[in-house]
Amino acid sequence: MSTAHYVFPASFAQQRLWFLDQLEGASAVYNLKMALRLSGPLDQACLQRAVDAVVPRHESLRTSFAMRGTDVVQRVASQLDVPVQSLALEGASDAVLAAKLNELGAASFDLQHGPLLRVHLLRLGATSHVLLLVMHHIVSDAWSAGILYRDLAAYYSAFSTGATAQLPELPVQYADFAVWQRDWLAGAELERQLAFWREHLQGAPPLLDLPIDRPRPVLQTYNGNRLSRALPIELSARLQTLAAAEGVTLYMLLFAAFNLLLSRW
């Protein structure tokens, strides 16, 4: 029996990611990879039940994308199976584990057919596992990944103890936001915002001339690295205060500061 799909407009952010996927082809650039180290006994059957409960709860996890005429749309499946894929890595070194996590996280998604969520369980020992969730950014972000982990933990805890998970009903799904956004930006409001950005971006360079230490490659490789730095407590507190005063998250504040830095070039 075929699975029914419910069709909604894509948000503008989803439309951009769809366009990039169609332009550049299958890629892992927009894969979100979240690994969690689990210590102690693990009931894999309960973990699968938890996944089976979370997927129906969040429409985004059952969403794929398609073109309808000239518009990108979300196709929300009425039901979708997401198996927990197990892999035995007993005795593996940290380097082998890291390589396997990178390999699993680098597999591309098919936005048109989905699913856009993969769940991997890497067994390191009888009481040691790594749970890896891989999602495409078109249906998730770091904030929603935290919600997914929270709900998974709640369902797993309930199923493993024979209790009933007490999770609140979700009054709004992402598709509801997409519909609202399309309605809000219809007509005059969209034209007003487009006019603002056309004016402010007039004459902007097509590429930032950053003071990098080596030539920019002709083709973008997406190779990169990460640099971590701890902020002093006093500075962190001041940033939190400023973010609260402006009604934004700390991420939004720091991202604005980063973009301000880039604007120097």
Label every PLM stretch briefly.
Residues 234-249:
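Surface-exposed, Lys/Arg-rich phosphate-binding patches that contact polyanionic backbones
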Residues 79-85:
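Short, charged/polar, Gly/Pro-enriched secondary-structure boundary elements
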Residues 2-78, 91-184, 192-211, 248:
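Acyl-group handoff/entry surfaces in thioester-processing enzymes
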Residues 263-265:
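Secondary-structure transition/capping motifs at alpha-helix termini
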Residues 223-236:
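DNA breakage-rejoining catalytic core of tyrosine-based enzymes
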